[in-house]
Amino acid sequence: MSIFNKVTKTFQWGQNTVTMETGEIARQASGAVLLDMDGTVVLATVVAKTEGKAGQDFFPLTVDYLEKTYAAGKIPGSFFKREGRPSEFETLTSRLIDRPIRPLFPEGFFNEVHVVVHTLSLNPEVDADIAALIAVSAALSVSGIPFSGPIGAARVGYINGEYVLNPGQTARKDSVMDLVVAGTEAAVLMVESEAQQLSEEIMLGAVVFGHEQGNIAINAIHELVRDAGKPVWDWKAPAKDEPLIAKVGALAAHKLEAAYQIRNKQARTRACREAYAVVMADLKLDGVAFDSVAVEGMLFDIEAKIVRSQILAGEPRIDGRDTRTVRPIEIRNSVLPRTHGSALFTRGETQALVVTTLGTERDAQRIDALSGDYEDRFMLHYNMPPFATGETGRVGTPKRREIGHGRLAKRALMAVLPSKEEFPYTMRVVSEITESNGSSSMASVCGGCLSLMDAGVPMKAHVAGIAMGLIKEENRFAVLTDILGDEDHLGDMDFKVAGTTNGITALQMDIKIQGITKEIMQVALAQAKEARMHILGKMQEAMAEAKTEVSTFAPRLFTMKINPDKIRDVIGKGGSVIRALTEETGTQINIDEDGTITIASADPAKAEEAKRRIQQITAEVEIGKIYEGPITKILDFGALVNLLPGKDGLLHISQIAHERVEKVTDYLSEGQIVKVKVMETDEKGRIKLSMKVLLDRPGQGGPEHV
């Protein structure tokens, strides 16, 4: 009899067969599920503490997605030969899992929860992120932890006008969309996508299609829970202190209402802090025993109620706008004198200084991914220091949020970048957020597009981004255009859309409540399009098209094509030839397998010299042509003459002079420059030369023949 109480569920999901197991591996975790999706195997575990920490007012959920190189039959390339800090993909996948599960834990549940996912085996054609989402949903569902799941998730492609469920790596090359959707049976909770300028209707259709397909996984998880689920925790939210809530409300309501009439963010924040301090002081004066953390939570609830009720009543928003108006926009290009491209994009109290740097192919990021190595010639890095929100704090390595925002902005711009053939540069865009009051990632999209155009990158179109919000109470709702930071915190949805005049290039949606309908999403998309067109108009006014020339401080790239068989000649033994070329000409030279050579130099003259020398190296020796070159070696029967770099010919002793030559050294010496004519090449490719045909015969007026 086995010591394991293993339960297995298998279901067909599109073209994939999925098997979920629990009860054999990681039995001491609160919940653990091993999921196999056609050779991609992930282990999802969840552990929750049985008690919350005293005085804690937030939900401490941590999600760690970890890839093991053995999953793809690899050994880590680092010095220590073991996995190190999380890769960007691991960080992004951790966020992808966190976003749809976080809203499903009950309000007031502050017990620490740790979700860990290990990728144990990888089929390159089956994405581990989707497998991980399903496995985490199953592990949480069987654990008994308070959780309003399960969730389903699916990747959606769009190929030849049709939606495709969970397309693999190969199929995605033909897809004009890469969309991931996650949600419960009833509602969509999270969307992450990039697209090739597609319409709102196609994008919304993909969300609906993906949500429907995710329900197949939800049904299978229900079956697993029925057979293997642990008892549901007997957890109840702490009872609310109604008398204290009423007391705080009486003391704070008017003060906070007055604070939210202030349009300036910094002044409003100060007024709210002062209101908090006054309420705490009044409670102490009244002799009320209270927990300051709990009172702060009550005050936040009052703030939320004020802001939400004002918006639903049709009153002006926090900064005085209506629901559809975009904040004032200011744009300045070429802000920094010696960078390759720069733009300062300001929208209200959100500002991004975005800088583009152009490099050679050698500057491309080499990524050692589990599914295979590749190079990325476009990078976008997002930084938001504490001063952007008027706060103090630590500055250092990028946090998960910064990595996620950078990735979203990158996705938005990728669809309109020129191909490598059109523009062979490596591009790095850095967005420095210098002010933030909502939607800084979308400011990075707008500023990034303008910065690239300022650098001379021939973009296919302008790209703008906008963040939408939602306030919903029962059947009443309001969609907000260009949300502020406070509206993001106090609202029910963060919906970011980026695109061109032709269509959407990136879409990200995070919903904090259930009950968002297709109709609400349609309204949000239509309102976002209206705002996007407005911003695109402002951007086109500021910069109608990309500069026709790259910056004088950027490297100039010159391309040429050689016979691929000649690549070894240009590189030389141990890289000696190309190393000498780069050092002597002061250029960077990159050679592709197809024989395309890219020469990079800020000085066109140096690039031309490198090109001339490469042409020399790769040139073929022509029969009948006269060459001038040094003697590289004296032999008993002749001499070797260098005709072209790396190409020597034999000058036989009989071809040195018309008279009989007894000793080669009587006529020639090493290093001597001589003129020779190529007479023939033998079957082994050896080159035969003659000097005497270029010399006058004794007693005659000219050479034999030239």
UniProtKB/Swiss-Prot annotation:
Cofactor(s) annotated in UniProt: Mg(2+)
Gene3D superfamilies, A to Z: GHMP Kinase, N-terminal domain, K Homology domain, type 1, Nucleic acid-binding proteins
Keywords from the named record: Cytoplasm, Magnesium, Metal-binding, Nucleotidyltransferase, RNA-binding, Transferase
Reactions catalysed according to its record: RNA(n+1) + phosphate = RNA(n) + a ribonucleoside 5'-diphosphate
GO biological process, one term: mRNA catabolic process
A GO MF label: 3'-5'-RNA exonuclease activity
Domain KH: 555-614
Entry keyword annotation includes Metal-binding: yes
Any one GO CC term of the record: cytosol
Enzyme Commission number: 2.7.7.8
SUPFAM superfamilies xref list: Eukaryotic type KH-domain (KH-domain type I), Nucleic acid-binding proteins, Polynucleotide phosphorylase/guanosine pentaphosphate synthase (PNPase/GPSI), domain 3, Ribonuclease PH domain 2-like, Ribosomal protein S5 domain 2-like
Protein localization: Cytoplasm
Enzyme class: transferase
Residue stretches making up the S1 motif domain: 624-692
InterPro entries: ExoRNase_PH_dom1, ExoRNase_PH_dom2, ExoRNase_PH_dom2_sf, KH_dom, KH_dom_type_1, KH_dom_type_1_sf, NA-bd_OB-fold, PNPase
Residues holding Mg(2+): D488, D494
Stated role: Involved in mRNA degradation. Catalyzes the phosphorolysis of single-stranded polyribonucleotides processively in the 3'- to 5'-direction.
Family affiliation: Belongs to the polyribonucleotide nucleotidyltransferase family.
Protein name (database record): Polyribonucleotide nucleotidyltransferase
